[in-house]
């Protein structure tokens, strides 16, 4: 986004369309031109209502027309922009890089400390240099600027870009560059670890009222302890790339790095002529977006000129818009499940995306399977990674096929469990490959028999409604257990024990659900709530809609309850 008005108008549009949204990202160039790269200040005149002011026009980003009439801005300052987003019950993240342009105060300070790495980085030919995150004094300077110029305005989260860092025109001698901990050759791979560490530790020392959230392009082993959420970089919008992203995410999980995501739809849409109206791109984006529901972080992103807000894909009644809207709502209905699974990651060193070998080690067919995985312990997810409803001509223009001819995709159901189709409620035996019909709005999702799923309310943002009236879907066929985790949602009081857990247990033979005593407490905790219980079967408790009838509704006040179903 190139101005506060543009960013805030996107939030407005989502609220107007009643499509859920929790976060929006201010990407680069709020600082201005490349020579002023990553000044960690809002110096672009469009962000501070200084268009036409000679003192600030020198910072206008490269390529923007100095004589263009942008009109009188509605949002006139960065603080006003951040406050506006907050009033719309959303959060804002901002891009911060690991390098600095020669005009910046940060460049001068790092240079005086001998904490710049002197090799070519991006953007080229602007004199930009990476900093030395191995140097604790450099990390102090880095955070001090972030805090003073951005965090103190109310910023919620950080996009730490180029944490490799970008290394252009690579020469072997570049790796002999000296850092605080020795040659760059020796410590290169730990660059993101140290850069993320600096931001995390400084923000934690500043306040415990706001959780640290770091989105970073690169990772190193152990980086998860710094609230680091990795994304897979600027990947191209192609079906083959989407397939490879699946393997990438699962490999991250196997390295013990649980929070990972990919640019939904890909970043560079070259293969679609950089045209968001290309119908073939719509199909790819929809399928990638559907998969995003079952990633630890769900986030759309693309490179200009392609914009990927939902309204770029048509309107209600258009298949691409409807599919995107459907899966956005599905993500929000799964929040109690996802948040509880995240607690398992924190408390038990678990993972959210789970390669099938983790849960089915005796099934040799899944040992190297990279087309499907478990999302938490209950969901089997099989993203659709082939084009079924569009095609492209030699000029890469997209064309739509007859969508009444439903395509299919292979799904393998692992041995050692029975599986219930999330959409239909049909129970299937494990150890078989089936051909699942996949209309454009259906991605294959199966729930392990012997699962308990808390189904959240329909909301426009994650904390809009309390979880005081939850549907509990029980997938029969085996005993089940699930622990519902809750806390204050945005501080570190949980580290001091301020949280609660409620364990639900299903006895399949007796068809009884036991809801144990609630353990723990926190400020604002619900004292009473309703659990609406439903045992899933075909036509009952299926899919992404609300159930209108239940097997039993229970008023729960924190004491053990047993329900016969």
Predicted segment positions?
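Catalytic-domain carbohydrate-binding cleft regions of carbohydrate-active enzymes
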Residues: 1-442, 447-448
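Accessory, solvent-exposed terminal regions and/or long lumenal/extracellular loops of proteins
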Residues: 442-565
């Amino acid at each position: 986004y190139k101005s506060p008005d543009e960013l805030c108008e996107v939030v407005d549009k989502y609220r107007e369309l009643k499509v859920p949204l929790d976060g929006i990202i201010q990407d680069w160039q709020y600082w201005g031109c490349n020579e002023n790269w990553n000044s960690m200040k809002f110096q672009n005149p469009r962000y501070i209502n200084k268009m036409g002011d000679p003192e600030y026009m020198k910072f206008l980003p490269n390529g923007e027309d100095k004589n263009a009439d942008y009109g009188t801005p509605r949002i006139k300052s960065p603080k006003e922009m951040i406050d506006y987003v907050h009033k719309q019950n959303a959060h804002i993240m901002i891009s911060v890089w690991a390098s600095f342009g020669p005009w910046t105060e940060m460049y001068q300070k790092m240079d005086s400390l001998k904490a710049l790495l002197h090799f070519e980085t991006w953007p080229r030919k602007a004199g930009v240099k990476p900093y030395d995150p191995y140097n604790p004094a450099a990390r102090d300077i880095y955070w001090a600027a972030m805090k003073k110029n951005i965090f103190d305005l109310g910023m919620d989260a950080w996009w730490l870009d180029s944490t490799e860092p970008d290394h252009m025109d690579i020469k072997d001698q570049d790796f002999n560059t000296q850092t605080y901990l020795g040659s760059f050759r020796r410590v290169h791979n730990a660059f993101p670890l140290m850069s993320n560490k600096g931001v995390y530790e400084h923000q934690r020392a500043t306040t415990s009222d706001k959780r640290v959230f770091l989105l970073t392009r690169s990772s190193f082993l152990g980086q998860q302890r710094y609230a680091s959420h990795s994304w897979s970089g600027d990947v191209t919008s192609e079906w083959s790339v989407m397939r490879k992203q699946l393997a990438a995410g699962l490999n991250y999980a196997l390295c013990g790095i649980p929070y990972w995501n990919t640019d939904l739809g890909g970043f560079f849409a070259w293969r679609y002529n950089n045209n968001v109206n290309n119908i073939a791109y719509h199909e790819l984006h929809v399928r990638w977006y559907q998969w995003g529901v079952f990633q630890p972080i769900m986030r759309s992103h693309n490179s200009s000129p392609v914009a990927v807000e939902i309204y770029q894909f048509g309107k209600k009644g258009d298949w691409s818009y409807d599919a995107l809207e459907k899966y956005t709502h599905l993500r929000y209905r799964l929040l109690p499940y996802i948040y509880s699974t995240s607690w398992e990651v924190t408390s038990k060193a678990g993972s959210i995306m789970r390669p099938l070998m983790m849960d089915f080690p005796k099934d040799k067919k899944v040992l190297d399977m990279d087309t499907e995985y478990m999302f938490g312990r209950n969901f089997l997810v099989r993203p659709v990674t082939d084009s079924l409803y569009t095609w492209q001509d030699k000029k890469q223009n997209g064309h739509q096929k007859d969508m009444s001819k439903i395509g299919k995709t292979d799904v393998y159901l692992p041995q050692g469990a029975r599986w219930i189709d999330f959409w239909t409620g049909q129970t299937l035996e494990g150890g078989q490959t089936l051909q699942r019909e996949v209309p454009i709005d259906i991605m294959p999702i199966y729930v392990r028999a012997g699962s308990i799923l808390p189904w959240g309310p329909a909301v426009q943002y994650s904390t809009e409604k309390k979880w005081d009236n939850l549907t509990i879907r029980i997938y029969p066929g085996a005993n089940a257990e699930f622990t519902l985790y809750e806390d204050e949602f945005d501080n570190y009081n949980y580290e001091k024990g301020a949280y609660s857990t409620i364990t639900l247990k299903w006895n399949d033979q007796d068809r009884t659900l036991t809801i144990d005593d609630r353990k723990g407490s926190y400020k604002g905790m619900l004292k009473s709530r309703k659990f609406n219980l439903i045992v899933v079967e075909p036509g009952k408790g299926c899919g992404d809609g609300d159930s209108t009838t239940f097997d039993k509704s229970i008023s729960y006040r924190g004491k053990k309850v047993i329900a016969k179903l």
